[in-house]
Amino acid sequence: MDNALYVGLSRQMTLRRELDIVANNIANANTTGFKVEDLMVRTEQAKPAKTLDGSSPVKFVMDTGVARNFTQGPMTKTGGDYDLAINGMGFFKVQANGGERYTRDGRFTTNPEGILVTQAGAPVLDDGGGQITIDPRLGPVTVGKDGIVSQGAIRVGRIGLVRPDDLSTFAKDGDNLYRNTTNTAPQPVTDAQIHQGMLEASNVQPVIEITKLIEIQRAYESVAKMMDNTAELSRSAVERLGKIN
């Protein structure tokens, strides 16, 4: 009987974790460049409790991490000079949290020194790893699809786009940023385009996520009912043994 309760508890734990992830997806449905996440689970075989008829394999549900769907989000027009969207697989490079970080959130601006930065103030890096400085005296800023930043006839820099060989090596690092978890540096991107005056919306589909919430609730209730039935069987068995004795 105990095995069934342990299996049920393990499933409830993963359902709670999945609920947190789905709720976070919904909360970020309007976050620029956000990528939808899903829970990864696996079954783990454990040593079972002894029963009257001997031992039998028992498998528990285990949380193994979070998978992100990096498919392209919809492009929305803003008209902002410093709003940039990536069409294709690539990431902007920024200097944050003590190192180089990566993002799809192109809501950029300039700080008082004229440096191109994120909404959190992290400098946006060019293809050489340097900062990009805008001089307001040189006129409007133009960003080409190839990432070249110009003011009139003057080339200011080129926004660096990179991507890792394996997207699963990117881990969240706050402020809509990712960090590289390996010693292999992400490679420059040549087949993606930058669109000025546009932003990439989240790829979250709210209807799908709400449906998941309903399914999680039903699954949780089903597991709870199974555990209640198991506990009731245990109580009945104890009562019968008491009467026999």
From Swiss-Prot:
The keyword Transcription does not apply. InterPro entries: Flag_bb_rod_N (IPR001444), Flagellar_basal_body_rod_CS (IPR019776), Flagellar_FlgE/F/G (IPR020013), Flg_bb/hook_C_dom (IPR010930), FlgE/F/G-like (IPR037925), FlgF (IPR012836), LlgE_F_G-like_D1 (IPR053967). GO terms for biological process: bacterial-type flagellum-dependent swarming motility. Keywords: Bacterial flagellum. One of its GO terms (cellular component) is bacterial-type flagellum basal body, rod. Transmembrane segments: none annotated. The keyword RNA-binding does not apply. Belongs to the flagella basal body rod proteins family. It comes from the Bacteria. The basal body constitutes a major portion of the flagellar organelle and consists of five rings (E,L,P,S, and M) mounted on a central rod. The rod consists of about 26 subunits of FlgG in the distal portion, and FlgB, FlgC and FlgF are thought to build up the proximal portion of the rod with about 6 subunits each. The gene is flgF. This is Flagellar basal-body rod protein FlgF. It is found in: Bacterial flagellum basal body.
